[in-house]
From Swiss-Prot:
This is Ascorbate-specific PTS system EIIA component. Induction: Induced by L-ascorbate. Repressed by UlaR. Keywords: Cytoplasm, Kinase, Phosphoprotein, Phosphotransferase system, Transferase, Transport. The modification Phosphohistidine is found at residue 68. One of its GO terms (cellular component) is cytoplasm. GO terms for molecular function: kinase activity; protein-phosphocysteine-L-ascorbate-phosphotransferase system transporter activity. The PTS EIIA type-2 domain is phosphorylated by phospho-HPr on a histidyl residue. Then, it transfers the phosphoryl group to the PTS EIIB type-2 domain. It comes from Escherichia coli (strain K12). The active site is at residue 68. GO terms for biological process: L-ascorbic acid transmembrane transport; phosphoenolpyruvate-dependent sugar phosphotransferase system. InterPro entries: Ascorbate-PTS_EIIA_comp, PTrfase/Anion_transptr, PTS_EIIA_type-2_dom. It is found in: Cytoplasm. The phosphoenolpyruvate-dependent sugar phosphotransferase system (sugar PTS), a major carbohydrate active transport system, catalyzes the phosphorylation of incoming sugar substrates concomitantly with their translocation across the cell membrane. The enzyme II UlaABC PTS system is involved in ascorbate transport.
Length: 154
C-alpha cells in the first residue's frame, strides 16, 4: 500500500488540526484510521503504552512524528493517516521537539512496516523543503500533489 494511495482512498488527511497535548494529536491520526476501518480503536492505547515503555520512539525527525503500534495491536490492514497541527506540540523528545506533522502508520506485518512505510516517508522528506511545503498545504489535494511531485522526482 502506497502512502499516497492510502491517504486518498481512506480520506485520512487532516490539516491544521488543533490539539492541546501530544496524546490528542496522536488520537486524531488514529481516529482517521479507525474511521477508514484500517485499525481497531485499541490501536491508540497500544501506541500510548509504547511511549510509556520506550519513550517518544516515533518522533523521527525535527517536527515529525510517525506514531505506530505493532501489527497484532489492532491492525486490520496497512494504511496511513497524515495530520498537521496548527500549533506544534512537545512530545518530550530531546532532539526533535516540537512536532507539528504526524504520519500515523498501521502495518499488517513488520516487513511492510519497515520496507514500505518507513521508506516512503523517508522518501517524502529526503528533500527537507517538503517539511515546509507540507505545513503550507491547506487541502487534501495539495498534500497528494506534493507526494506525486516527490515520487516523480525520485
Amino acid at each position: 500500500m502506497k502512502l499516497r494511495d492510502s491517504l486518498a482512498e481512506n480520506k485520512s488527511i487532516r490539516l491544521q488540526a488543533e490539539a492541546e497535548t501530544w496524546q490528542e494529536a496522536v488520537k486524531i491520526g488514529v481516529d482517521l484510521l479507525v474511521a477508514a476501518d484500517v485499525v481497531e480503536p485499541r490501536y491508540y492505547q497500544a501506541i500510548l503504552d509504547g511511549v510509556e515503555q520506550f519513550g517518544p520512539y516515533f518522533v523521527i525527525a525535527p517536527g515529525l512524528a510517525m506514531p505506530h503500534g505493532r501489527p497484532e495491536e489492532g491492525v486490520k490492514k496497512t494504511g496511513f493517516s497524515l495530520v498537521t497541527l496548527k500549533k506544534p506540540l512537545e512530545f518530550n523528545h530531546d532532539d526533535n521537539d516540537p512536532v507539528d506533522i504526524l504520519i500515523t502508520m498501521a502495518a499488517v506485518d513488520a516487513n511492510t512496516h519497515q520496507e514500505v512505510g518507513i521508506m516512503q516517508i523517508v522518501n517524502l522528506f529526503e528533500d527537507e523543503e517538503n517539511f515546509d511545503r507540507l505545513r503550507a498545504c491547506r487541502t487534501e489535494q495539495e498534500v497528494l500533489d506534493l507526494i506525486d511531485r516527490t515520487n516523480a522526482a525520485a
